[in-house]
UniProtKB/Swiss-Prot annotation:
Organism: Ictalurus punctatus
InterPro entries xref list: Ribosomal_eL33, Ribosomal_eL33_CS, Ribosomal_eL33_sf, Transl_B-barrel_sf
Gene3D superfamilies in UniProt: translation elongation factor selb, chain A, domain 4
Location relative to the cell: Cytoplasm
Gene: rpl35a
Name of the protein in its database record: Large ribosomal subunit protein eL33
Amino acid sequence: MPGRLWCKAIFAGYKRGLRNQREHTALLKVEGVYSRNEVDFYLGKRCAYVYKAKKTTVTPGGKPNKTRVIWGKVTRAHGNSGMVRAKFTSNLPPKAIGHRIRVMLYPSRV
């Protein structure tokens, strides 16, 4: 069964007011989601920012490589156009704005 167990999303920026931004919450635009009703499926799903670093790190059960991941979770909807809010274990770096986030299709709530 080929295929991926994640949906594509873009990190649009941080949760913010007019003058202040709150870096502890990320705003994600999930591909193919255009209304608040469609967001319900993604609530509670795990998300991951996968990136490459300069130094290698040990990966569990594998060879050391340069790939790293920051894990997070979709917490709630943001607005009426299919944006979601997500909290990550450590805040996403600003260089990640506009880059791909993986929204995993687990855990299932069905």
